[in-house]
Amino acid sequence: NRTPQLYYGTEVLMNGTKEVTDGNVRKDFPGGFAGDKHNCFTKEGRTDAEEAMFNWTSQLLHWRQGNDVIAKGSQTQFIPYKGVYVIARQYGGKSVMTIINGKRSDNELDVKRYAEIIGTHTTARDVITGATVDLTKNIHLTQRQSLIIEF
């Protein structure tokens, strides 16, 4: 398992693996070049799926910008457990947990495993949707879901 990261193009679902070649990860961004039929530089040029990912990434990066917990916080990485990978950051009495279900099936986050981070908190906020997340019971995760919560 590796630390999750964004490459350029992630925001429009570009993908490539180093198994093919290292250059496969560095494909030209679609659009802006002579002969490009697909233009991801504009909303009109993106597919619905690319637009959804673009909006999700934009929202995540704007939330991250100026966030002291992310910029200055201490980090704890937990050993993946039953396909779930968790990274926590803490700063100034606030916490952020990034939760990733690596499985291609639904899964659960066992909240008791993360008591040292959660402490006495009973709820958290999903940073993307704003929804309240109940920390008193296991958290249901859909296949390959990533969830970022703050409390």
Predicted features and spans:
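Loop/helix patches that line or flank the sugar-binding groove of alpha-linked glycan CAZymes
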Residues: 1-118, 141
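Short, surface-exposed, polar/charged, turn-prone segments marking secondary-structure boundaries
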Residues: 33-37, 124-128, 151
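Residue-level marker of intrinsically disordered, low-complexity segments enriched
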Residues: 68, 82, 94, 125-126, ...
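A residue-level signal for conserved active-site and pocket-lining positions in enzyme catalytic cores
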Residues: 60, 124, 144
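Solvent-exposed beta-hairpin/edge-strand motifs
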Residues: 114-130
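C-terminal beta-strand-rich structural cap/linker in extracellular carbohydrate-active enzymes
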Residues: 134-151
